[in-house]
Design a protein with these regions (language model features):
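Hydrophobic/aromatic-enriched cytosolic interaction surfaces used to assemble or bind macromolecules
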Residues: 1-313
């Protein structure tokens, strides 16, 4: 089964607020970094494109950047599915930085009621806007996953901050994901060293993007495995997470089946079938018109015969 994994653009709300800029235009042209894979492990193609130009695939996964997800660890309330979101809000409302109605929540996979579980929080309007923009271009997202999530063993990934110069101070950041949460901090200053236990756990998996590898090895004092963005997107796609829960849950199976059938029917491979069906419809219309014309002539002939018989009588 072919898989398309795309990275959602960075949520710029906080940056716009800080600079008193206007909110981004909903109709702006979005460019998506993407990768395709047949097995979810090795990528076949990669690049960036507008939504309408993205490759088609059997499954589409959207990845949310680590800085666009907040994490809350709670005791999962015991509530029916229809009331679970309200129960979650009741537990973490005081910890939310914004109004609960503007936040989308998602529960960790395999979470058990009454036990500790992680809840992901994302700006609802922003995520809905991104999903709508993709859907309008014919890209239907099956799953939404975080780029990083609380996990064991710990993982540290070095990469360049959005729109930053990798050679500039603070250009390189570290995303530290472990059992106690996820945090992304700049390498300059002491916050990164304070965040990571010293010495780091021996089981820690260290990776870096190609542009951040040198800074990562200087900071860490040890070699790191280079992981391009394409591999990192596939890694995120293999997780069990799915942020499409509650009000953002995907459509029903019936609607999805109809949508997938329509998408397949409009694909280039089905063009001969479409042409054949169109020709069949045209032939049927022409045939019906000829039959109607023939029937009309027969009726008129009978009418003329009856009129002639009446005159003779």
């Amino acid at each position: 089964m072919s898989t398309l994994v795309i990275q959602l653009p960075e949520h710029r709300r906080l940056r716009a607020r800080a600079t008193d800029e206007a909110a981004p235009d909903p109709g702006r042209r979005r460019e998506y970094v993407y990768v395709t894979s047949a097995d979810g492990i090795e990528f076949e193609a990669q690049g960036d494109a507008a939504a309408a130009l993205l490759p088609r695939a059997s499954q589409v996964i959207a990845v949310v950047r680590e800085t666009d997800v907040a994490w809350h660890r709670i005791t999962l309330p015991k509530a029916p599915a229809s009331r679970l979101r309200a129960a979650l809000v009741g537990v973490i409302e005081d910890a939310l930085l914004e109004d609960s109605e503007s936040v989308h929540l998602a529960v960790a996979p395999l979470a058990v009621a009454g036990e500790q579980a992680w809840v992901a929080a994302v700006d609802r309007a922003w995520l809905q806007d991104e999903l709508d923009a993709l859907q309008k271009s014919g890209v239907f997202v099956d799953r939404v996953v975080p780029m990083a999530w609380p996990d064991e063993p710990p993982m540290g990934h070095f990469h360049v901050a959005e729109s930053a110069d990798p050679a500039a101070p603070g250009g390189t950041v570290l995303t530290w994901a472990h059992l106690d949460g996820v945090a992304t901090v700049r390498l300059d200053g002491g916050l990164a060293h304070a965040l990571v236990p010293q010495p780091p756990p021996v089981t820690t998996r260290w990776t870096a993007s190609p542009t951040a590898a040198v800074a990562a090895e200087q900071w860490l004092g040890a070699p790191v495995m280079v992981m391009p963005l394409e591999q990192r997107l596939l890694q995120a796609g293999r997780s069990l997470w799915n942020l499409r829960q509650f009000e953002l849950a995907r459509k029903t199976r019936g609607a999805r089946a109809a949508r997938d059938w329509l998408r397949q029917a409009m694909s280039p491979a089905w063009r001969p079938v479409r042409i054949g069906l169109a020709a069949l419809v045209v032939a049927q219309i022409v045939g019906l018109n000829l039959w109607a014309f023939h029937q009309k002539n027969e009726v008129q002939a009978r009418r003329n015969a009856i009129q002639a018989l009446v005159k003779q009588s």
